[in-house]
Amino acid sequence: PGTPGRLNDLRHIIYKPADAPWRRARKSLGLMLREGILKENIDGEALLWAHDRLLARNEDRRIMMVISDGAPVDDSTLSANSGSYLERHLREVISYIETLSPVELLAIGIGHDVTRYYSRAVTITDVEQLGGAVVGQLTDLFDEDANKQRHRVA
């Protein structure tokens, strides 16, 4: 076919299930550093998968934080489709989540400007800044909520 769609296989890894205690996840978290475990970046489908997992949870509030070091890439898919195929899909998924979903979406780009994709996003230049960026993003989100509450009461 002329435009076959995504051609690469997917690998979604759960390093720590939400209900598992941190102490049981140590070994799994170490797998993040294992060479060859990750596939190419098919970000739109990964977001949808994580989004659906969050929706299945019975929580009052669901927050998804994306940490990205680059744009969606899959050489096979990009060679058989338009060069913007994966990026366009990512933008569609983000738009859906940000406008129609109860899931709150935040993003942090490491050496990659994610503010062009996500409404609530920040870009850092070094992984050493990640801890502060995570806390900052969550603080901003909760401050937004506090401001909304104050405006409702006033």
Q: Model-found features: residue ranges?
A:
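Acidic, glycine-rich A-domain
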Residues: P1-A154
